From Swiss-Prot:
Stated name of the protein: YcgL domain-containing protein Sbal_1869
Gene3D superfamilies assigned: YcgL domain
InterPro entries hit by this protein: YcgL-like_sf (IPR038068), YcgL_dom (IPR027354)
HAMAP family, sorted: UPF0745
Amino acid sequence: MLCAVYKSSRKADTYLFVKKRDCFDDVPAPLMEMFGVPKLVMVFPIAKRDALGMADIQKVRAAMEENGFYLQIPPPQVNLLAEHKLSLGIKD
């Protein structure tokens, strides 16, 4: 199975994996609206890959089989100031 990866034009570090290039039929309309204009990053055969950058390859494969797409969002940012205050015993 081929996999096309698109970068969001609205959300930083957000990627959409779909089964076919330029085929977003399985992606819900509200998600596409939030995602913005998709910008193609790459197309590759997912069956031949053992790993992906930040995404778990098994989760990507499972989501694409079940839903027809996979949405990769960035991990939440760590609030270093809040962690520092907490380490000093300062509560907001």
